[in-house]
Amino acid sequence: LTLTLPLTPDQQDAAVAFSAWLDRPGDGTPFVLSGYAGSGKTFLSMRLLARADAAGLCWTVVAPTHKAVGVLRQHLQLAGLQPTWFPSTLHRLLRLKLRRERDQECCEETALTAAALEHLALVLIDEASMVDSALLEILLRCAHPYRTRLVFVGDPAQ
């Protein structure tokens, strides 16, 4: 249903840019989809994932929180999309161990972290503005050896 609704002109521009990015050989440059609340980022994300799916890519979606992952799962189901890997938190995908250090949670890499993205061609990271620099650094390092394409979706106001 949602994949048949028309796109706004801005969404069309983003979809064209995504297709061009997807058609180029992966060079480690991520695709960034940025927009304010209510601008249709999630709606457009489903279209972009349908394009990746049609290209035969192994893909999944992640978010920093379980609540955001739940929202993504609902939208994927409504769009009739089935990711290669079950949607999860970014921490789970990267096989990170969470530990408390003083009053903060810290991510600790495990023996499985380095190869976490080995079989994925594309990962869409929703709520990307909530990903801290340490987690981003781990994600980029894990994606690099496998040329896993990263799509960051976020709100510039957050």
Regions of interest found by a model, annotated:
Residues 1-158:
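Conserved ATP-binding/catalytic motifs of P-loop helicase motor domains
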